[in-house]
Amino acid sequence: MVRVFFAGTPECAVPSLRRVACAHRVVGVLTNPPAAVGRSGKLVHSAVAREFFRLKASGVLPESASLFVPGRLDRAFYDAVEALRPDVLVCFAYGKIFGPRFLALFPRGAINVHPSLLPRWRGSTPVPAAILAGDCETGVTLQYIGEEMDAGDILAQSRVQLDGTETTGALLSRLSLVAADLVDDVLVGVERHTLAPAAQDHSQATFCGKLCREMGLADWSNPAVVLERKIRAFTPWPGLFTYKDGERIAILQARSCESSFVPLAPVGTVLAADKNGVFVQTGDGVLSLLQLQRSGKKPLFWRDFLNGSPLLLTGRLGV
C-alpha cells in the first residue's frame, strides 16, 4: 500500500481526505494554519485540520499520522515530511504553490485535484468561471503537478453535466464528492502501476483569476443573463449586490427574462413587480429579482422585502 501525504485546506477537500484515509495509508496531512473568523477574530482550524482530528480520534488514521500547519514551507518542514517516507502527494486546494524541493520528496509523483475539465479553466476559480461562462458541463481532473500551474499530464477526469441553476457553493460540494471517487481510483492505479498519463492540449487552455469583493457590484449595463450567472457564480462569495439611496442590497436569487416593457428604460430602472418578481431593466433583457437581503437583515423573498422596504425597490438601482 502506497504511503500518501495529503495537502488541502477548505471543506471541498474533506471528502477526498476521508476517502484516502479509509482506503489507503495516510502518513501526513498538510493544511494552512488556523485563521481568524468573525468579528471576534477567533482562530479556527481549517476544515481539513478538523477532519484530521476526527479521523484520528475515531481510529481511521493511525497514531503515527502527522498534521502539519506551517506558516511557511522551510527546510525543517521538508526534513519532517521526508522522515515520513511518503510515496505520493495528493493535493486539493491547499492554497500555496509547491516548489521543486518539496515535490522531489514523492517518488511516485505529486497529484493535484482540480475542479474543472483541464485544460479548460486553469487557475484558482474554475467553478465560478464555468458558471459565468454558461458552460454545459464541467468536472474534476487529476493531474501531475508540474512547473506550470494546472498544466501537468492528466491522470483521470470525471465529467459533470450542468443545468444552469448551480451556484458555486452547491456545485463545488457536488464536485468534491466526485473528486473523492476519482482520487481513490487514481491511488489504486498508483499502487498497481497502471496509470497512463496524457499530456494536455495547451492550445485549448483557458484561464481564470481570483475573485474580489468589488466584482460583486451589479453592473446593470450587463445583459440579464450575465447578471443571473454572476449571482450563482458569486454564491457564497462575494455575492451580487447593488445600492439604493446609499443602502447595500444583496441579490440572492433572480431570473433573466426577455423584456416586455416598452419603451426601453435606463439600465437599473425598477420597471414593475408582479407574481413573478421585481423587474429591473438591464443592458439586454430584464432581470426578475426573487430574493434579496438588506445589510444586517435576514434574506427575504421579494414580496416580503417589498412589504418591509417598498421604497428601496423603486426608481433606479445602483445610482
From Swiss-Prot:
Reaction catalysed by this enzyme: L-methionyl-tRNA(fMet) + (6R)-10-formyltetrahydrofolate = N-formyl-L-methionyl-tRNA(fMet) + (6S)-5,6,7,8-tetrahydrofolate + H(+)
Enzyme class of the recorded protein, top EC level: transferase
Gene Ontology, cellular component aspect: cytosol
Keyword entries, A-Z: Protein biosynthesis, Transferase
Residues reported to bind (6S)-5,6,7,8-tetrahydrofolate: 116-119
GO molecular function: methionyl-tRNA formyltransferase activity
The organism's place on the tree of life at top rank: Bacteria
Protein EC: 2.1.2.9
Record InterPro entries: Fmt, Formyl_trans_C, Formyl_trans_C_sf, Formyl_transf_N, Formyl_transf_N_sf, Formyl_transferase-like_C_sf, Met-tRNA-FMT_C, Met-tRNA-FMT_N
Family under the similarity heading: Belongs to the Fmt family.
Biological role: Attaches a formyl group to the free amino group of methionyl-tRNA(fMet). The formyl group appears to play a dual role in the initiator identity of N-formylmethionyl-tRNA by promoting its recognition by IF2 and preventing the misappropriation of this tRNA by the elongation apparatus.
Listed name of the protein: Methionyl-tRNA formyltransferase
Species of provenance: Treponema pallidum (strain Nichols)
Gene designation: fmt
